[in-house]
Design a protein with these regions (language model features):
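Conserved non-cysteine loop/helix-boundary elements of the Radical SAM core domain that shape
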Residues: 27-38, 61-160
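N-terminal pre-triad scaffold of radical SAM enzymes
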Residues: 1-28, 46-61, 65, 95-97, ...
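Short microdomains enriched in Cys/His and/or Lys/Arg
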Residues: 38-48
Length: 160
């Protein structure tokens, strides 16, 4: 079964810090998020639907759950609409920070049928986290993992 991801980059949206290892302009090729998310997803789905059995929509490059809620829901609504139209879309995933996870945020993600939460942990050593200007602690990660594991999400931990 062939699988693909549609990567939607939201460069530095809601990132409170300038972490030493992150250069979203270089990664995404731009500092601006996609303005026409519906058009972008439709074009990507049309392009991929004949070549892949399963496709997921992946929001990367920022702290997705830290985006102002109306804006976050605008992105999630577009993903939900694409998922309804293109039956090969099997999941919606996003990356975020451990300190941007709460019961309320997880309720919102469940409402839009997000399947996977990727936490940018980077380290479980508080000295390393402070030196790299992450702005969260190892305990924040532990709390976020506990909250996510109570729900039906798949969980990915990212380390740099």
């Amino acid at each position: 079964m062939k699988h693909a991801s549609i990567s939607v980059f939201v460069p530095h949206l809601a990132c409170p810090n300038d972490c030493v290892f992150c250069n979203q302009k270089r990664i995404a090729g731009t500092e601006k998020p996609i303005a026409d998310i519906d058009g972008f997803l439709a074009a990507a789905c049309e392009d991929l639907s004949d070549r892949f059995d399963e496709v997921d929509i992946a929001f990367f490059g920022g702290s997705f759950t830290g985006i102002e809620e109306p804006e976050m829901c605008r992105y999630l609504s577009a993903a939900a609409r694409a998922r309804e139209k293109y039956k090969k879309i099997t999941g919606i995933r996003l990356s975020t920070r451990p300190d941007y996870i709460s019961e309320h945020i997880l309720d919102v993600l469940e409402e839009y049928r997000v399947t996977t939460v990727e936490l940018g942990v980077q380290s479980m050593n508080d000295a390393v986290l402070a030196a790299s200007r992450r702005g969260h602690t190892a305990r924040d990660t532990e709390k976020a993992v506990e909250l996510i594991k109570k729900r039906a999400f798949s969980l990915v931990l990212q380390f740099m």
